[in-house]
Amino acid sequence: MSFMNSFKKLVGVEDDYDEYYDDQYYYDESDHVESESKDYEQKQNYETKSNIVSMNNSATKPVESKPLNRVKINIHEPISFDDAPKVIDVILKNEVAVLNIEMLEKDVKQRIFDFVSGAIYSLDGKMQKVTKDIFVLVPKGVEIDGKIKDQITKNNGFFQL
């Protein structure tokens, strides 16, 4: 080993060995220093919390929905304007309705359509035209897929399963 030590002295490289390196260091509780990271975390949490906006609105009511394992579709062919509220009663039960007003006179069709479309709008439901005088009405939270309409128009007005 002396050869290595003499070679290191000749080159000018010395060991960086510290005599105090072997001493045991005992942690004294009086040496404890508060970390600024905790303060930073608290400030960061405070700033993050201030950016959160509540989406709850007291004016809206939760809507109870039926399980989607069974879907009931009601087909309505009203004879007069007095039958129009029955269609909306179905929507209020969170069920799907099909409105067929093909066989009615033009003025009765218009009155029923206006009543039903206004009620659907006020209930946040959706209405989609299938053919000229047939409409699908769904309550809030139900999506209408346009594939059925495409199949009916492709098959000259007939739906085939």
Curated annotation (Swiss-Prot):
Swiss-Prot/TrEMBL keywords: Cell cycle, Cell division, Cytoplasm, Septation
An annotated GO cellular component: cytoplasm
GO BP terms: division septum assembly; FtsZ-dependent cytokinesis
A Pfam family reported for this protein in Swiss-Prot or TrEMBL: SepF
Main subcellular location of this protein, as a coarse class: cytoplasm
Record bears the keyword Cell cycle: yes
Coiled coil region boundaries: none
Alphabetical list of InterPro entries matching this protein: Cell_div_SepF, Cell_div_SepF/SepF-rel, SepF-like_sf
Subcellular location: Cytoplasm
Subunit structure: Homodimer. Interacts with FtsZ.
Family: Belongs to the SepF family.
Function description: Cell division protein that is part of the divisome complex and is recruited early to the Z-ring. Probably stimulates Z-ring formation, perhaps through the cross-linking of FtsZ protofilaments. Its function overlaps with FtsA.
Protein known as: Cell division protein SepF
Species annotation: Finegoldia magna (strain ATCC 29328 / DSM 20472 / WAL 2508)
